[in-house]
Curated annotation (Swiss-Prot):
One of its GO terms (molecular function) is tryptophan synthase activity. It is an enzyme of class 4 (lyase). Pathway: Amino-acid biosynthesis; L-tryptophan biosynthesis; L-tryptophan from chorismate: step 5/5. This is Tryptophan synthase alpha chain. Transmembrane segments: none annotated. It comes from Mannheimia succiniciproducens (strain KCTC 0769BP / MBEL55E). It comes from the Bacteria. Tetramer of two alpha and two beta chains. The active site is at E49 (proton acceptor), D60 (proton acceptor). Pfam families: Trp_syntA (PF00290). The keyword Lyase applies. Keywords: Amino-acid biosynthesis, Aromatic amino acid biosynthesis, Lyase, Tryptophan biosynthesis. It catalyses: (1S,2R)-1-C-(indol-3-yl)glycerol 3-phosphate + L-serine = D-glyceraldehyde 3-phosphate + L-tryptophan + H2O. The gene is trpA. The alpha subunit is responsible for the aldol cleavage of indoleglycerol phosphate to indole and glyceraldehyde 3-phosphate. The lineage of its organism: Bacteria, Pseudomonadati, Pseudomonadota, Gammaproteobacteria, Pasteurellales.
Amino acid sequence: MARFETLFAQLNAKKQGGFVPFVTLCDPDLERSFDIICTLVDNGADALELGFPFSDPLLDGPVIQAANNRALNAGCSTAESFKLLEKVRSKYPEIPIGLLLCANLIYAQTLDGFYRRCAEIGIDAVLVADIPLLAAEPYIQAAKKHGIQPVFICPPNADENTVKGVAEHSEGYTYLVSRAGVTSAENQSHAANLDSLVEQLKAHNAPPILQGFGIAKPQQVKEALNMGVAGAISGSATVKIIEANLDNHEKCLADLAEFVKNMKAATL
């Protein structure tokens, strides 16, 4: 059984939801980023969603854009990101790891080369943020060739065909976006039709649904789970803690530990 399937089976058996933090690899630099990721896992993260630094991210709001810039300014390349992932996988052989990145970074490695490298490291899933489902077939084929699970976003304005396509082609988990726009911890509004989308995705046998965008507080995790999703992803709120503590690494780790514990507690 693949890692995400194993995780969701374990969570279901314990009647828990999942909490999945997102951070950008190498933010604010390679060494501190490893400490940060270890802190997330050690304090209750059920899985990791990790981003590759990119100069022009499509869906990212100002907080995660700044994280990308910090990582790039620290000299982080795709090769360095893969090195960091190797280190994380070596320390945590069981935790599911999903990547979120833009297509240009994959093309720079070639499709086959990128997914082969992911498989060598032990990455579980890849979500390509700027490739719509209609153009995704080459990515799906390359991912499956190397045993990587392709993940797709279900946007809040998805029609029936989009919901069906996302459900059929996603593996590992399904990413449900809370609202239109870019990532943000400040904008915590959620689209009014999320309940309906959850029902539709489940009707089409989608993989377990993780809700992201604007998830910054434990109460929002509870609300997401009450709607029927399997867990919640928190990116901007996690990265804001890094941003607020760039000059105090120990406080950064302590604040992240408290944040993850509180968010995970909301899933119990």
